[in-house]
Regions:
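Bacterial N-terminal signal peptides
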Residues: 9-19
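Bacterial N-terminal signal peptides that target proteins for export
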Residues: 1-9
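Lumenal/extracellular ectodomains and adaptor appendage modules
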Residues: 20-134
Length: 134
């Protein structure tokens, strides 16, 4: 009997000690980044994200750019088409308010390129922007 109880305790310990996948978390499986450098020093960047997006309202890219660079020409699209670019992104918007929209959020260390998840599940996002020299 003592062996059986010890075995059950061991099973419980192992059950909770083994990391299990988080079923509701977002997972970017691949990111493909291409950059085109112009003669004036500016750069056009295209990022393609593929993954499972199953929680939250938005995804974002922290952009800790130096003061002499600005971000322009932001566009985001997914498998269903292009998003609307809004001038003032609000991180507190609801899922519905962020759906099919993208924008910039100012932070203490730079910017965040933000876009609404729009649909839970497998998604394919294309994020494009230009880094300009002031």
């Amino acid at each position: 009997m003592r062996k059986r109880v010890s075995g059950l305790i061991l099973c419980f310990v192992l059950l909770f000690a083994i990391p299990l996948p988080a079923f509701a978390s977002n997972q970017v499986n691949t990111i493909d980044i291409q950059a085109l450098l112009y003669e004036d020093g500016s750069m056009y960047v295209t990022q393609v994200w593929k993954g499972d997006f199953n929680e939250g309202t938005e995804s974002y890219i922290p952009m800790n750019v130096p003061d002499y660079l600005t971000i322009s020409n932001l566009t985001v699209s997914d498998q269903n088409g292009i998003y609307d670019t809004v001038p003032d992104w609000n991180i507190d918007w609801s899922f519905e308010e962020k759906a099919r929209k993208c924008g910039m959020n100012d932070t203490d260390s730079g910017y965040e390129i933000c876009f609404g998840i729009s649909r839970y599940g497998q998604n394919h996002y294309t994020i494009e922007y230009k880094l300009d020299i002031r």
